[in-house]
Amino acid sequence: QTIRYTAPNCSSREMCYQWGQELREQGKEISRYPSWEEVLQCVSGEKSDRKKVLIIENFHYLLKGDTFFLQELIRYLKEHREVSLLVILTTYASGWVENSMISKIGNLAFSVSGFLKVKELPFSVMRRIFPGGTLQKSIELYAVLGGMPGLWKLLEMSASVEENLTTLFLEKNSFLPELMIKWLSEELRETAVYNTILATIADEKNGKLNAMYARTGFSRAKISVYLKNLMELELVEKVLPGTYEISNSFIRFYFRFLFPHQTAWRRDNGRAFYETYIREDYSSFVRTAYRRICQEILQADFHTVELKKAAQWRTYFLCKDTAGKKIAVDYSGTVCYTSEDYDALQTALKSIRMETDEIIIFCENGYENALAEKVSGKLQFRSVGV
C-alpha cells in the first residue's frame, strides 16, 4: 500500500493540523491538533503483514524550520519495528539537500538509509516516448525542455515547435516561466545577483569570466563565488577553461530569450514575440543543445570525452577509448556536412596540433557527394537519432 503526503510551506503545528484533517477526511480517528507521533501511528496503522510505503513530497518544508519531525520519524520507526513501513522523502530542492541538509540535521543523517538524485532523462528516452515526431522537432524541443518528463507531458507533438513554445512560454496564461522564477527564488537567496550572472552567460558572447566582469561590474572574486554556487546546483557548468554555459535547458531558454525582453514578452502576443526575438536566433540556441546530445552519446561509447576549442571559436570533441585510441568528433547539427566543413575541421585540428586515429561526424542531413569521394573510408558519419 502506498500513502502520499505533500508537505505545505507552513509551520510544523499547521502541518500537523492539515495532515490530521486529511486523515479525518479518510475516516481515520485523530485529534484536531495531533502530535507527529499520532500522525505516524495513524498513517502506519496496526501491525500487519502488508507492507506500506509512505511518500512525503516537498519534505524540505518539514526540515527547514526545525528537525523535530525527522527526530520523531526516526524514533517512531525504531520503537515500532513491527510496523512494516518504508518512508521515502522527496523534494525538488536538490541544492538544499546537497549543500545544507546534512549540516541542518546533523547526526540524524546517519539514520537515513540512502540518497538518490534523479537525473534528467537523456534525449534517447524522449525519442522513444515520442516516436512519431521528427528528429528535428525532437532536438528543437529537447533544447528547451531538457530531460524533464514532467514538461514533456505538456507538449503537443502534432503542433510545430513554434506553436509549442508559444503555448508553453509566450502566451499571457503561460505558467511555466513563473514556475521557474519561483523555483529560482527559493533556491537562490540574492536573486538579483544570480539573475545578472545568468543573463550574462545566456548571451553566449559573455561566457568568459573577463566578459562577465566587464558586463556586470561585479568583482572577479564575487563572480567566481556565485558561479561556484550555480555549478553546485547544476545550473551552470564550465565547458572550457574559463568559459561557462547554462546547463539547465529550461533556464537557458528563459535567460536567453525572455529575461532580456521583459516588456515585450509581457506586452506582445506570443507569435509576434517569437518572430521578433526568437526565430532568427533559435538555430544557434539549438546547436548548443545538439552538442550536448552528441556528448551524451559519446560518453556512453568512450572512456573519456573532452570538448576542445580550435581556431575561429570552433569546438570539437576529443574522445579516447579504453585502448587509448584518439577520435576527433565534429558536430555539424541538422545541416548537410560539406567539403568546406571537413577542410575547416582539418585546419582546426592542425592549429591545436591534434593528431587523431579516427574522425566521427555527427550530422542529421547527410553529407555532399563530393566529400564522400574525397575522404572515402576515413570518416564515420553518425546521427543522434540512431
Where are these regions (language model features)?
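Conserved small helical "lid"/interfacial subdomain of P-loop NTPases
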Residues: 112-138
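Conserved P-loop NTPase "ATPase switch" module shared by AAA+ and STAND
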Residues: 43-73, 93-94
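Accessory nucleic acid-recognition modules appended to NTPase machines
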Residues: 151, 157, 163-313
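A short beta-strand-to-loop transition that corresponds to the Sensor-1 phosphate-sensing loop
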Residues: 58, 89-96, 100, 148, ...
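Sensor-1/coupling segment of RecA-like P-loop NTPase cores
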Residues: 61-65, 74-105
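Conserved NTP-binding/hydrolysis module of P-loop NTPases
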Residues: 2-3, 12-30, 41-44
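A cross-kingdom feature that marks ATP-driven nucleic-acid transaction machinery
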Residues: 247-386
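A short helix-turn-beta junction within AAA+ P-loop NTPase domains corresponding to the substrate/partner-engaging
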Residues: 2, 101-120
